[in-house]
């Protein structure tokens, strides 16, 4: 008999919340509108969701690929090609996603008399290595 660890339950919770986020804000359609679609192979939204989830699981892609429970169905080269693709307009993607989040969620929290402002900070920062 195997014991289900607390980490497994947390991973499932985080994974379901990430999926809910992608469905609620229709990240796939925004990615497609930003030229983030592929002609063959694994869907680009699946690769993007995988990269997005790595941040919240606090894991590296290398360790995730080496783990026994690997279920993503694509190789690291697919991820690298997706990230380095010159066709994807990342500025348009971040702007459209921010706009969708504001219009569907945040705008409802403010008074109608207030002026709406969208500030997207995409500055680069250095990480200690």
Task: Outline where the language-model segments fall.
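Short alpha-helical elements
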Residues: 1-129
